[in-house]
Amino acid sequence: MAAQIWYENDGDLSVLEGKKVAIIGYGSQGHAHALNLRDSGVDVVVGLRPTSKSVDFAKEQGLEVKSVAEASAEADVIMILAPDQYQRTIWANDIEPNIKPGAAVAFAHGFNIHYGYIKPSEDHPVFMVAPKGPGHIVRREYAAGRGVPVVVAVEQDPRGDGWALTLAYAKALGALRAGAIKTTFKEETETDLFGEQNVLMGGVNKLVEMGFEVLTDAGYQPEIAYFEVCHELKMLVDLMNEGGLNKARWSCSDTAQYGDYVNTVINEDCRKRMEYHLQRIQDGSFAKEFIDDQDAGAPHFKELQEKYSNERIETVGPKLRAMFSWNKDGVKDADEANSFTGKIARAQVQ
């Protein structure tokens, strides 16, 4: 069955007229949602801890900032954009005790609703608008008159206006310029986690790291190894984005194509491991492991961060990336992203 996709003419901004939208958190997605909605004429308030370093960022950009409790008490729509592991505490302590009857609760990722960490009462509409790109790209594309695609879902619809509200929000974000694909909280959560763990992060990162180690352990120069297993990956992914796997293949040499076809690194054993990890996502095992570690102060998470931030490939990358003139514009994007992430984003509403 073909996916249902909505575009610009399918959303009605008048649905948000007279309504106040609270954006909880001002990290990567938070700043993009707040600014895009504000520039679309929506009445926006940002909810943050009074001591959050993000308060100054938001105020400098002309946004109204209040505590999470105050913002929640006056909002008709509450978009929760704090990190997954903090959302349930923010909900229990600041949002649920203050939320107006019938106010809508929104998310950009289904994690806490799908796994039951947040359970709004049945009188609250619950919807999702999840951009398929980082916040600084969502903001940049909006400012350029374009948009980043989103996936959208409605989990609770007590009044029957859930989809109209969802599409109005997506339009205000600029997303309907690109398109909004209908999904469910379950599908978005499970596929998003699967993609991160098995392809985008846990797959690609491990391939790059291991490929680099195999070459350098065999005596090849680290700089040459970096070019072959990391640098060229970006160009190949760009070709995939433009024309799929086929364009990436026919853009390469016959030698490269043949090596692709006969490669045995990614095989049926890999598929079985992917299926195992999908099962852990589906049955909630991964979510419980992550949340339990976070509740304990994230000792395992911090240990892994330290371990992988010191991989050998990271000692070579900075020097070589400085050689690429076309990376100069990307540095600005990286700086912008970093200013809204890392320690500031993690501390935003705790």
UniProtKB/Swiss-Prot annotation:
GO biological process: isoleucine biosynthetic process; L-valine biosynthetic process
Pfam families given in the database record: KARI_C, KARI_N
Residue ranges occupied by any KARI N-terminal Rossmann domain in the UniProt entry: 3-183
Enzyme Commission number(s) of this protein: 1.1.1.86
Keyword set, alphabetical order: Amino-acid biosynthesis, Branched-chain amino acid biosynthesis, Magnesium, Metal-binding, NADP, Oxidoreductase
Record-listed Mg(2+) 1 binding positions: D192, E196
UniProt keyword Oxidoreductase present: yes
Binding site residues for substrate: S253
Protein residues bound to Mg(2+) 2: D192, E228, E232
PROSITE patterns named among the record's database cross-references: KARI_C (PS51851), KARI_N (PS51850)
Cofactor note: Binds 2 magnesium ions per subunit.
Pathway info: Amino-acid biosynthesis; L-isoleucine biosynthesis; L-isoleucine from 2-oxobutanoate: step 2/4; Amino-acid biosynthesis; L-valine biosynthesis; L-valine from pyruvate: step 2/4
Similarity annotation: Belongs to the ketol-acid reductoisomerase family.
Biological function: Involved in the biosynthesis of branched-chain amino acids (BCAA). Catalyzes an alkyl-migration followed by a ketol-acid reduction of (S)-2-acetolactate (S2AL) to yield (R)-2,3-dihydroxy-isovalerate. In the isomerase reaction, S2AL is rearranged via a Mg-dependent methyl migration to produce 3-hydroxy-3-methyl-2-ketobutyrate (HMKB). In the reductase reaction, this 2-ketoacid undergoes a metal-dependent reduction by NADPH to yield (R)-2,3-dihydroxy-isovalerate.
Protein name: Ketol-acid reductoisomerase (NADP(+)) 1
Organism: Bifidobacterium longum (strain NCC 2705)
